[in-house]
Every structure is written in C-alpha cells, then in structure tokens.
Design a protein with these regions (language model features):
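Ligand-binding loop in jelly-roll beta-barrel domains
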Residues: 85-105
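General beta-strand recognition
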Residues: 37, 47, 64, 91, ...
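A short, N-terminal "cap"/entry segment at the start of jelly-roll beta-barrel domains
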Residues: 1-34
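Short acidic-glycine-tyrosine-enriched beta hairpin
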Residues: 70-90
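Conserved short histidine dyad/triad with adjacent acidic residue
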Residues: 29-51, 81-86
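A generic structural motif
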Residues: 29-31, 66-68, 93
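Acidic, Ser/Thr/Pro
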Residues: 10, 20, 25, 38-42, ...
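Short, conserved beta-strand element in jelly-roll/cupin
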Residues: 50-65
Length: 105
C-alpha cells in the first residue's frame, strides 16, 4: 500500500523543477528531522544522480528504472519502491504520470 499522507511536516513551498519541468517535486521535513520529497515525473526518459541514498516509492502511475551499472529495466508500480545507492545514477522511463515519494536514507 502506498503512503497517502504525512502529518506535522515543514514544507518548502518553492518547487524543485528538473529537466524543463518533466520532473517537479517539493521537499519537506518531518518533525523528527527526516527529509523527503514528493513529486511527479511526466512522460520522458531521464537520468538522475544521487548524493544520499534514496528510496523511490510509487504512489501513482508506474515507471521503469535502471540502476547505474546494470542493463536491466525493472518496473515499479503503486505501493512498490526501489533503492538507489548514494553517489550513484539511475535512469527512469515514464509513459504516464509517475507520482512518487523520495525517502532520503
């Protein structure tokens, strides 16, 4: 089951806009200091880099992703997540709006 809401957060109101608007997210911090972002990727194939490790949780739509150093595309749908190591890259391929929560590890 996908996460539907968070309570007691501090939200950054200015959006993070990547790839000419193909990915838009908002960052927020939980009361315990945990940082996350919530966003949407519009249809495209994009490459993202990571500084911290990330867990991408699908809350709407679906995507295909390929981790750095692999040739295999995998699918993530609502309620599923995938892990990206710190200081890495991943490709994401979206054919319909993909809604996600990024959990920074």
């Amino acid at each position: 089951m996908a996460t539907e809401q968070f309570s007691g957060v501090t939200l950054t109101t200015k959006a993070n806009v990547y790839f000419d608007g193909k990915c838009v997210s908002h960052s927020f911090t939980l009361a315990d200091g945990t940082k996350k972002s919530v966003g949407v990727v519009r249809p495209a194939t994009l490459t993202f880099g990571t500084a911290a490790a990330e867990i991408m949780e699908c809350v709407g739509g679906s995507c295909e992703y390929k981790l750095d150093g692999t040739d295999e595309w995998k699918t993530s749908t609502v309620g599923e997540s995938f892990h990206i190591p710190a200081n890495s890259k991943f490709d994401i391929r979206v054919t319909e709006a993909y809604h996600y929560i990024c959990h920074y590890a």
